Amino acid sequence: MAYRKLGRTSSQRKAMLRDLTTDLLINESIVTTEARAKEIRKTVEKMITLGKRGDLHARRQAAAYVRNEIASENYDEATDKYTSTTALQKLFSEIAPRYAERNGGYTRILKTEPRRGDAAPMAIIELV
């Protein structure tokens, strides 16, 4: 299987890809290097496909990869409580239904200007 090493050990690379995948699911658009964007595209596409399946096994597989981070927090004045939505809940309730009729190609990579400082090629990766 071909993949990019991204100048890191396998555990560091896996952690970074999990973080970037979770950030993309929460924010729906992130700025990163071109190589990282191309690499996380694979995992994000797999997570959205799991979200479209929607069964318990798919939810557990996605939960094993996506970080348990809060995606949004809303205040309900009637009950005087905060309700929060995690990245996993957002994946299954908001993102996956949006792509129900689409077979793959859930992300878009737009190349931008090189990063100032080391001239690394940068890109914006976003959900279509």
UniProtKB/Swiss-Prot annotation:
Alphabetically ordered keywords of this record: Ribonucleoprotein, Ribosomal protein
Family the UniProt entry places it in: Belongs to the bacterial ribosomal protein bL17 family.
Cellular component aspect of the GO annotation: cytosolic large ribosomal subunit
A biological process from GO: translation
Organism of derivation: Streptococcus equi subsp. zooepidemicus (strain MGCS10565)
Protein name: Large ribosomal subunit protein bL17
Matches recorded under Gene3D superfamilies: Ribosomal protein L17 (3.90.1030.10)
Keyword rRNA-binding: no
Subunit text: Part of the 50S ribosomal subunit. Contacts protein L32.
Superkingdom assignment: Bacteria
PANTHER family for this protein: LARGE RIBOSOMAL SUBUNIT PROTEIN BL17M, RIBOSOMAL PROTEIN L17
NCBIfam families: L17 (TIGR00059)
Annotated GO MF terms: structural constituent of ribosome
Transmembrane portions of the chain: none
Signal peptide (from-to): none
The keyword Translocase is annotated on this UniProt entry: no
InterPro entries in UniProt: Ribosomal_bL17, Ribosomal_bL17_CS, Ribosomal_bL17_sf
Stored SUPFAM superfamilies: Prokaryotic ribosomal protein L17
